[in-house]
Amino acid sequence: MTDSDDTTCKRYIKMITNIVILSLIICISLAFWIMSMTASTYYGNFRPVSPWRWLFSVVVPVVIACNGFKKKSLDHSGALGGLVVGFILTIANFSFFTSLMTFFLSSSKLTKWRGNIKKQLDSEYKEGGQRNWVQVFCNGAVPTELALLYMIENGPGEMPIDFSKQHTASWMCLSLLAALASSAGDTWASEVAPVLSKSSPRLITTWEKVPVGTNGGVTAVGLASSLLGGTFVGLAYFLTQLVFVNDLDISAPQWPIIAFGGVAGLFGSLVDSFLGATMQFSGLDERTGLVVSSPTQETKHIAGKPILDNNAVNLFSSVLVALLLPTAASGFWPRE
């Protein structure tokens, strides 16, 4: 067999594989649709989901997870975890989906941005990020749980955020947005500040100057980045509302969603920094000159105690922001 024949054979195999995968996805989507129709028949309060929504909710997360794995943004376990999170958020509400995608895609791009510089500053730097299932869980567990609760409360579909008409469902929507905006704000700050900031970070608890990479260290550039990251996620949610929600003219204004996203990004970054400064170990490895998160005999302590790792800090930050901010926002949210 010549090289040309071998290449043609590989193309045919790839094409057939894609057709088989697409056929399986369509079958899975139809099976989900049949189950939802059956549930709607026997349980009158259950609203059936259209087959197109099922198809979109299966196909798009699969494509994005595969693309993330191919570009090293996710490893095997991270791709599988992201697939589950993406499916649940997409089937629940397209505004949830666009917020998640905005967070994931922007964070992946920023992680790769100026990677050669970050490699010199971060002892745990991985090319592309290569997030595993633990990182996906710590950033996606809270939004996933809220999306499930939202479907139980309201059913799948988009709705305006209006506390005067649907208080519980609106609270859940803002809580989910807060969790994603918080994660985006923290990621934007940690990826942008080490590269662009010209001043040394200051520890959030004592305001002392600390080396770049210290957990709990903040800079003006980092805080501005976290505000922008959260705002970007909030903007994605808002624009999706404009496209998919029909009764916006008789609902409360939706523009505060953008500002809420920015506040969540900034507040989440501050909470993450405080937890990192107090409950996460930071030390200077005297051999390499890099900040490390594990205490050893050759490590000089900078701040924090070895209670939580970075993933646990992200999870706790997400939980706190998701609980506190929607409750505060409900008192200030404009009414119709």
From Swiss-Prot:
Gene Ontology cellular-component annotations: membrane
Q: Mostly located where?
A: membrane
Which superkingdom heads the taxonomic lineage of this protein's source? Eukaryota
User: Pfam families recorded for this chain?
Assistant: DUF92
Q: Where in the cell is it found?
A: Membrane
Q: How does it sit in the membrane?
A: Multi-pass membrane protein
Which parts of the chain span the membrane according to its record?
15-35, 49-69, 78-98, 218-238, 257-277, 313-333
Q: Which UniProt keywords apply?
A: Membrane, Transmembrane, Transmembrane helix
- Cross-referenced InterPro entries, in alphabetical order? DUF92_TMEM19 (IPR002794)
UniProt lists the family membership as follows:
Belongs to the TMEM19 family.
Identify this protein by name.
Transmembrane protein 19
